[in-house]
Amino acid sequence: RFPYVAFKPNREIGKNVLEIKNLSKTIDGEKVLDNLSLTINPGEKVAFVGPNHYAKTVLFQIISGEMEPDEGSYTWGVTTSLSYFPKDNSKMFGAGINMTEYLQEFSKEDDDNYVRSFLGRMLFSGDEALKDCGVLSGGERVRVVLAKMMLEGNNCLIFDEPTSHLDLESIQALNNGLIDFKGVLLFNSHDHQFVDSLANRIIEFTPKGIIDKMERFDDYLVDEDVKAKRDKAYEGHKGAVVI
């Protein structure tokens, strides 16, 4: 039995997706984001790379509405709808509620069988769907979050390191589901194959701002223009691109 992951947006995305202007954020005295400006367009699947993993997480938290920026702004297009997969999903689940009840909160259909069908895709069958959310393992929580995101049917997905708690079959299923996804994807992952198979745009956080290229990850790694920019950004101390 393999998981089945498919994200089917309920509405098509319009031409305005996301505009980020002069975004800055300092946490515990460290400037995590410094005057970041970006435009995200329809059809883009953007991988965020670079050694500063914290910057990626903070950016995702800000644009998903979980954290306020110190300066700057971001604007989602009117046709966009967002599902967010956080790096730490423990706060999403409380004890005393089972998986079916949890997903019911996000369902447009008032039907347990409809909700359970999404849990079934992630290999929760029968009475497993009544398991208390408070006792789920890390891998089980990830599978419930994926079921929730499929159920929501949104056209823009943010994934912060989704592959960390998944087995190989689940990673492959997620990979296939995101390849087929017709909306906009913003993500980061430590899995090279996952990044290269999905991304059509690479944004690298460097000590001197971002490098932004419309290309696959394997092409980015051998791009002479990127190499020159990285030399400048890392002042000759650059290693391999960190994902």
Residue ranges of model-derived segments:
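ABC ATP-binding cassette signature C-motif
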Residues: 10-243
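Short, flexible cytosolic linker that couples an ABC transmembrane/permease module to its adjacent nucleotide-binding
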Residues: 1-11
